[in-house]
Amino acid sequence: YTQSITRNHRTAFILAIDGSGSMAESILFRGRCMTKAEAVATITNDLLFELVERARRSDGVRDYYDIAVVGYSGDDEVRSLLPGGEDLVPVSALAAQEMPVHTEVIEHRLPDGSIALREIPAPAWIKPLSAGQTPMCEALRRVRDIAAGWTSRTANAESFPPVVFNITDGEATDCDNEELRTVCDQIKALGTVDGNVLLINIHIAAGDTERPVFFPEAHEARYTNRYASLLYL
């Protein structure tokens, strides 16, 4: 991958967010106890905010990338979580909308070493969701179609390829392991002149491991959580 991300060679960020019932389970995140759904919503909103700010220049927000956020939950429900329900929007369109804000409580270390809680405003485009099943396969098919449409455009032919993040805590309820691998392979087979689409799975787990594992090698991926093992093998 060598292509720089510019207005003439934009890229795309596509997020698939698990909103199934198990996302109501509590975890420790940033020093506070919250549900997995709340943690994922916070991470996603922070990422969207950072993407907007990184594209901001003196003349406004420049379209360095397009953004998609697909949620999957409920009774095989797959839908866009972006305001307005569009599958894919340029970053300037997201920035142009009034940003929903909620109050977030964070820990703040005082000069004497003690910890105090502080309330700060935080972006809230994405709301926490935890209900029903995990139609991951259908969500990834939706992601595949979004990525296929994006990479097929002549204007994107030489661009840095889309980056896909799939954030989940469990196994798909709408397909078997082989079907899941197949749709993932279909996503990774898409690309531009610069290279193939990057698919990054992020597994959210409570108490399975003492430390986060980033880009696991084969022996690291085979840890006790069988759901995570499938995502990384």
Show the residue positions of the predicted features.
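Acidic, low-complexity intrinsically disordered regions
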Residues: Y1-L233
